[in-house]
Amino acid sequence: MSSLSILFATSEMAPWVKTGGLGDVAAALPAALRKAGHDIRVLLPAYPALKQAFPTATTVAELPAFAPGLPASRLLAAQTGKLELLLLDCPELYDRPGNPYLDATGRDWPDNALRFGLLSRVAARLGQPDSPLSWQPDIVHANDWQTALAPAYLHYQGGAASVVTVHNIAFQGCFGREMLAALGLPEHAWRFDGVEYHDQLSFLKAGLQLASQISTVSPTYAREIQDEHFGYGLAPLLRHRSAELRGILNGVDTDLWNPATDPVLATGYAANRLAAKRTNKAALQTEMGLEVTADRPLFGVISRLTSQKGLDLLLTVAEGLPELPAQLVVLGSGDKLMEAGFVELAKRFPAQIVVKIGFDEGLAHRIEAGADCFVMPSRFEPCGLNQMYSLRYGTPPIVRATGGLADTVVDVCEDTLADKSANGFVLDGDTPHALWLTIEHVCRTWQDKKLWQRIQQNGMRRDFSWTHAANEYVALYRDAIATRA
């Protein structure tokens, strides 16, 4: 089957600009599509970090002011590996340090509508016959609200087929009606089946309404966001477009997250060499100042410390861990009261509980390798990555059956052990008591070393590479092109 030309439009891309999962996807999915033989280019703003990383990027197009509120800009071309980047250079909109969406006080930049309206407009322009480049994509792939206006421009002005991917539906990019003219959208776009949403212009709603096809980052999340509880007001629209909506589970970087070759571990290991994992446990206990012992399970957490992540449940029951007996290591930051609560616990039980506020990439890898079990009781989780890292590292996770957690973690029971799919523990409910019962179940199961090893190996043998996801996206792109035709 013929290869496709794809424009992947994003507001962030690891390792240069990342606030969440979108940054990881923007680095990994285009690379997987390129490896599969497709002609893909990634469009993103020329933030300071990108301009510093690619000082020799060349100008490939000068772009006029497309609308009253949008300044002139230019496109720079750069190369990372075999992947071509198109950097949208507009210093007055993007030459700002730090977080791409928030100022130093943590507030949204007041001109975010213009900043990401321009990004969306340029993405659409590259997919139109009058593209400033000699290259034109078959498909424009928008991601989250920051580029979700691109399908609207393509709908009203004509051009390539489009896909919009929802990474987190809670963020919708809503602005005042005055932005309609400022962004160069036609007056007739202001209607319920256009860009209007509760008397505001919503970038995400516009994309969901007008894209050729829609995706989100796991099959379960695709179902959940059609329900009022998870849809943040957009569930009726998503139910209406359910035939064009599919969930495609994110992959993980299997080179970066590989316990056999991970350079920051005390020693490498694999599914057939699990004894070496115990060395990593002892090394983690030593590094974190915990009692070095093989006789109690070590639970690990790497997370934002928020109620959305379910860490309030763990905070409520964690003081019981030393009596089980069990240990706990926590790496993360978030809600200040929750941070303080975990820090106080660590002070009370210094040999069995340790808490590090902040983030450390190397330590994250060592926790995945050294912990016996990973705790991730999120109340909602569109896809989630840490549960897949945990499975790769032979560290069975505790999760709730939501979003991508439900699509990747199979609860330990008689049937799943028999068919070799059991790889983790799914807690029944959304209460501290439910989590505690699951922790006790984990501790009992962990005592049976042969059974525990089977569970570890089941998880380690799952394929979480991006190859499968890339193939699903190609099928989605072809459906979008057929729909547009």
Swiss-Prot record:
Pathway: Glycan biosynthesis; glycogen biosynthesis. GO terms for molecular function: alpha-1,4-glucan glucosyltransferase (ADP-glucose donor) activity; alpha-1,4-glucan glucosyltransferase (UDP-glucose donor) activity. One of its GO terms (biological process) is glycogen biosynthetic process. It comes from the Bacteria. Keywords: Glycogen biosynthesis, Glycosyltransferase, Transferase. ADP-alpha-D-glucose binds at residue 18. It is an enzyme of class 2 (transferase). Its EC number is 2.4.1.21. CDD domains: GT5_Glycogen_synthase_DULL1-like (cd03791). It catalyses: [(1->4)-alpha-D-glucosyl](n) + ADP-alpha-D-glucose = [(1->4)-alpha-D-glucosyl](n+1) + ADP + H(+). Belongs to the glycosyltransferase 1 family. Bacterial/plant glycogen synthase subfamily. Synthesizes alpha-1,4-glucan chains using ADP-glucose. This is Glycogen synthase.
